[in-house]
């Protein structure tokens, strides 16, 4: 949500999707962007159908953001990559910025990131953002990761209790149940604008391949 809000603050027309059938995250996307958003799911739709959804919904968009689900390669049954974020990136030819929880680790982060990149030759991972790190640590580890992994580190978010989405016994609160949700979005967006390289993300997005859309028969 922070990246979406930061992009919107730059007056970029963004369309957002959630990988998989999750209905809560798209509600947050709608709260941030003020437009209808949706889901892309390679379990329920093949590549052509997903292409048609994108063509239908993004005519006025300048940028499409797809939020992943679970671990990057985690798919159906917990033992496959089927319907994973990785599969969606392949189907849509989307460059991937990996979000990594960096709390409690240092050089091992480079090993984790490189391992994820090399697990599949076509991982499409071209950048990384670190979550839950201090500014001081980020300034030191950024160079290590870029040197070891060969991709840019596009910023970070510090650990901050105010960024957390309140939870309940059945899971995350829905946006219309959150008190001061607009303030929460603005807090995260302001942090993202300060610590995440939005211009770097836009440069990566500009390198996305053209997607060929097959008409429905």
Give a label for each model feature.
Residues 106-216:
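Internal gly/pro-rich beta-alpha loop/helix module
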Residues 1:
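Glycine-rich phosphate-binding P-loop
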Residues 96-99, 154-156:
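Short hydrophobic alpha-helical runs that function as membrane-insertion/retention elements
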């Amino acid at each position: 949500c922070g990246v979406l809000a930061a992009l919107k603050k730059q007056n970029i027309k963004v369309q957002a999707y959630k990988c998989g059938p999750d209905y809560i995250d798209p509600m947050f996307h709608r709260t941030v962007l003020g437009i209808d958003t949706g889901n892309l799911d390679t379990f329920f739709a093949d590549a052509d159908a997903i292409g048609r959804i994108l063509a239908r919904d993004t005519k006025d968009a300048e940028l499409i953001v797809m939020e992943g689900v679970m671990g990057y390669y985690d798919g159906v049954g917990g033992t496959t990559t089927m319907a994973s974020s990785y599969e969606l990136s392949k189907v849509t030819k989307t460059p991937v910025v990996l979000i990594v929880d960096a709390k409690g680790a240092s050089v091992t982060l480079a090993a984790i990131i490189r391992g994820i990149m090399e697990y599949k030759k076509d991982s499409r991972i071209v950048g990384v953002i670190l979550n839950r790190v201090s500014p001081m640590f980020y300034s030191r580890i950024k160079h290590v990761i870029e040197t070891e992994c060969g991709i840019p580190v596009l910023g970070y978010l510090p650990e901050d209790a105010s960024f957390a989405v309140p939870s309940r016994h059945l899971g995350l609160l829905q946006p219309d149940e959150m008190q001061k949700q607009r303030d929460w979005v603005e807090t995260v967006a302001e942090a993202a604008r300060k610590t995440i390289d939005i211009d770097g993300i836009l440069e990566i997005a500009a390198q996305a391949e053209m997607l060929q859309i097959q008409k429905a028969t």
